[in-house]
Each structure stands twice: as structure tokens, then as C-alpha cells.
Design a protein with these regions (language model features):
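C-terminal motif of bacterial Sec signal peptides marking the signal peptidase cleavage site
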Residues: 7-11
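Bacterial signal peptide processing site
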Residues: 13-16
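Post-signal peptide N-terminal segment of mature Sec-exported envelope proteins
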Residues: 20-44
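Short, surface-exposed binding/anchoring microloops in extracellular/periplasmic proteins
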Residues: 40-79
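A short macromolecule-binding patch
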Residues: 77-87
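Flexible glycine-rich surface loops and low-complexity tracts that mediate binding to linear polymers
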Residues: 98-136
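Short peripheral tails and domain-boundary helices/loops at the edges of structured domains
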Residues: 128-158
Length: 158
């Protein structure tokens, strides 16, 4: 009986080959982060999230700079981090944005859609802290672009 207890205690206290405690890899991604962020894409957490009466026509060119995805508006000589509709995806291999309805947009693509300009505190209220934290890291000025939360809210400029 004592031998069995010793074996169980030894197995429970198992360490790596150098005697250090075993490190079990875990993910620091929270459920909110998984819903709100995909690579550089910040998005509404779900399709039922309200986007209010965002009616301003926004246009510009997509630009990736590090982990930040921007809408560059040359007419204003500014760029803005973007909040996309829920279910928008980042295709890392091709470095493209894929909208919920399947439209693929590459970096350098001229895009347009309905939305508005918002402060980072508004991003937190609309889509949560994870997206707000990324937006804060990406700010060049004091605002972000938030598109309507509908699958067809933004697409290539026609």
C-alpha cells in the first residue's frame, strides 16, 4: 500500500527532465477576443449587436501596418483603425479581409461603406474591451472608423 501511494505521489509531482515543474501551454485568448478580433480585424462580437444609425458614407484604401488595419483617407490625410461587421475574417495567408457575405478585399483596395467616426471609448461600448485595446494601440489621431454591423456594410468602391 505504501509503495502504491509513493508511486501516485511521484506521478502527481512529475517534473520536466531537468527537475523543473512541467509547463502546460495555454491560450491567453478570451472568448471576447476570439469574437472581436481576428488578426488585425476588429469586429462586432455578434451579428445581433446594434450599430445604430451609422449613415455616413466612408471611403478610403485598406492599409496594413504591423498588427493594425487602417482605412486611409487621402482627402483628409489621415488613417483610422476599422471596426468591421460581425463575422468579418482575416485571411492571413493572402493578407485579405473577407466580409461576412464572402467579398475579399486586398490591401490597397479602395473600399466604401456606411458607418461613422468614433472615439476609442465608443469602441469599448459597441464591441468590447479587446477591440478597444487594439484600436488604442493603432490610433494615429483620436478616432476610429466603425462600419454598420450588417454583412454588406462595406465593400470595394464601385
Amino acid at each position: 500500500m505504501a509503495v502504491a501511494l509513493l508511486l501516485v505521489a511521484t506521478a502527481c509531482g512529475s517534473a520536466g527532465s531537468n527537475g523543473a515543474p512541467k509547463v502546460i501551454p495555454t491560450s491567453s485568448t478570451t472568448a471576447e477576443e476570439a469574437r472581436a478580433i481576428d488578426g488585425p480585424v476588429m469586429r462586432y462580437q455578434d451579428s445581433s449587436s446594434t450599430s445604430g444609425a451609422l449613415a455616413t458614407l466612408l471611403d478610403g484604401v485598406l492599409q496594413l501596418d504591423g498588427s493594425c488595419l487602417y482605412l486611409v483617407q487621402e482627402s483628409r490625410d489621415q488613417r483610422f483603425p476599422i471596426v468591421w461587421p460581425a463575422d468579418t475574417r482575416w485571411d492571413a495567408q493572402n493578407q485579405t479581409v473577407v466580409t461576412p457575405d464572402g467579398v475579399v478585399m486586398s490591401m490597397g483596395t479602395a473600399v466604401e461603406g456606411r458607418g461613422g467616426y468614433f472615439f476609442v471609448s465608443d469602441v469599448n461600448l459597441l464591441v468590447g474591451a479587446a477591440a478597444s485595446n487594439l484600436a488604442r494601440q493603432c490610433l494615429d489621431n483620436d478616432q476610429t472608423v466603425i462600419f454598420q454591423n450588417v454583412p454588406t456594410a462595406v465593400g470595394p468602391k464601385t
